[in-house]
């Protein structure tokens, strides 16, 4: 029931995201007295969704300067991923390594047959084999649950909404053909905000599910809890720079790779680490020491 409810929640939020995009089109249409902008917004949404679907793996891997590794180069990674893939009765994904020393990992790809798992050099140095197994279990469940498709498409549509909102704010309010400039300004400001909230809610739901499903796959919730605690500490000491390419791919990572608190943390696509660890402790029936 829990997973079913989360699936319905994700579908509903994605529907709202599309409604926001079409709402932007409606505001533009009201100003221009034409339905063409609505169709343009719909086409942009479809094109962006298709692009996110087909290129999610390439975008994320490129942003982290990751490269494929062979079993001879990363025997431990291959051993763990192969074991968990067999346990789940799923195809084994391609394995990549990113040279960054910030500890993190992510999975990407539109489906299990076209998936890739990437670890950073930093996470391999930081975690022991048991903790790394917990992280890889989490990432594989993102693949098997097709969360990468969901998160990539949501991020792409949210990005379109933000861009269109900025264009409306710059050009739309001063257009003399616009019958309601105040509504245009309000929509231009609120639509990107709403898109960010929706993206955050969907991403957090999928992260909690991947934690739970990954812990079930490995049979060791506390291994993932211990890894998350170490990763949080490692990121705080060596965060990624807020480069836009990295920001665009950050929703795929197991932990928020940037330093920040306050408002930035409130609107993070990742749930609070303390809550994630607490849930895993409840699964294990005992606290992480």
UniProtKB/Swiss-Prot annotation:
Localization (cell): Cell membrane
- Name the record gives this protein: Protease HtpX homolog
Query: What biological-process GO terms show up in the record?
Result: proteolysis
UniProt entry keywords in alphabetical sequence: Cell membrane, Hydrolase, Membrane, Metal-binding, Metalloprotease, Protease, Transmembrane, Transmembrane helix, Zinc
State which residue ranges cross the membrane: 11-31, 34-54, 152-172, 182-202
Which Gene3D superfamilies is this protein grouped with? Answer: Metalloproteases ('zincins'), catalytic domain
Q: Lineage of the native species?
A: Bacteria, Bacillati, Actinomycetota, Actinomycetes, Micrococcales
Looking at the record's lineage, which domain of life comes first? Answer: Bacteria
Q: How does it sit in the membrane?
A: Multi-pass membrane protein
Known PROSITE patterns for this protein? ZINC_PROTEASE (PS00142)
Cofactor: record remark: Binds 1 zinc ion per subunit.
**What gene is this protein translated from?**
htpX
State the needed cofactors, names only: Zn(2+)
């Amino acid at each position: 029931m829990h997973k079913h409810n989360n699936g319905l929640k994700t579908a509903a939020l994605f529907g709202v995201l599309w409604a926001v995009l079409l709402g932007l089109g409606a505001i533009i249409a009201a100003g221009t007295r034409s339905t063409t902008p609505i169709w343009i917004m719909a086409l942009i949404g479809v094109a962006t969704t298709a692009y996110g679907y087909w290129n999610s793996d390439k975008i994320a891997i490129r942003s982290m300067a990751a490269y494929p590794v062979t079993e001879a180069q990363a025997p431990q990674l291959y051993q763990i991923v192969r074991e968990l893939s067999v346990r789940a009765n799923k195809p084994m994904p391609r394995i990549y390594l990113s040279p960054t020393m910030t500890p993190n990992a992510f999975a990407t790809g539109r489906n299990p047959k076209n998936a890739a798992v990437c670890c950073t050099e930093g996470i391999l140095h930081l975690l022991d084999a048991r903790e790394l197994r917990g992280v890889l279990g989490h990432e594989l469940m993102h693949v098997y649950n097709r969360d990468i498709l969901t998160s990539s498409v949501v991020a792409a549509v949210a990005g379109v909404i933000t861009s269109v909102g900025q264009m409306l704010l710059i050009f739309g309010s001063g257009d003399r053909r616009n019958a309601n400039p105040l509504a245009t300004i309000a929509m231009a400001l609120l639509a990107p905000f709403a898109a960010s909230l929706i993206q955050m809610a969907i991403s957090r739901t999928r992260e909690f599910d991947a934690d739970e499903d990954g812990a079930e796959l490995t049979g060791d919730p506390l291994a993932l809890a211990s890894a998350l605690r170490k990763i949080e500490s490692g990121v705080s000491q060596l965060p990624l720079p807020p480069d836009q390419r990295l920001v665009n791919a950050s929703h795929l990572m197991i932990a928020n790779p940037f330093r920040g608190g306050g408002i930035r943390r409130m609107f993070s696509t990742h749930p609070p680490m303390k809550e994630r660890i607490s849930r895993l402790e409840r699964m294990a029936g005992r606290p992480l020491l």
